[in-house]
Amino acid sequence: MPTSNVPAPYLAILTQILRVFERVYFITSTFGLDGFESYRVVFYSALDVLSRDAEACTQLVSAMAHDLLERHGVSAPDAQPAAHVRMGQRMHVTYLLLVVEQWVSELPDTMINQLILPLCRPYLQDTRFQDSVESAHSVVLALYTSCLLYTAPSPR
């Protein structure tokens, strides 16, 4: 059930676009997002429209995390140190964190605490994988920004 005025078919299409991009992230990560202008425009536009529906964001992140844990046979988000994570799994985590970075204010606190932060932890502790470290760091900074917006008074 949508929690915004974005029609459900649009939400479904945008969700599928992000899921397809998840499958080809290993290619775009090799060349960088700057090498694919159309990809970047579609990626950030899909994230922007989906961010208007918190339930759609939560469902997509939950599905992506479930696939990550199931596909790579991981028992918990932070079950392995970064040095022992295979490249495919690391790419999957990095893409998920890129998505989450844009939506931290839309996701429930329990998801952040039980899933997102544990996914970030191995890459914040072991900084040898630059893309993953940057994604994890960006998520943490986005969390701080989100918290600041909720707790700091607005200047008037």
Q: What is the role of each PLM region?
A:
Residues 1-52:
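Extended, helix-rich scaffolding/adaptor regions
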Residues 2, 17-24, 71-76, 85-102:
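HEAT-repeat alpha-solenoid elements in large eukaryotic scaffold proteins
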Residues 60-84:
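Acidic, Ser/Thr- and Gly/Pro-rich intrinsically disordered linkers and low-complexity segments
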Residues 95, 134-135:
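Alpha-solenoid helical repeat scaffolds
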Residues 100, 139-146:
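Hydrophobic residues within the alpha-helices of tandem HEAT/HEAT-like
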Residues 109-117:
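Core helices of alpha-solenoid repeat scaffolds
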Residues 118-126, 156:
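HEAT/HEAT-like alpha-solenoid repeats
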Residues 150-155:
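Conserved small/polar residues in nucleotide/adenosyl-binding loops
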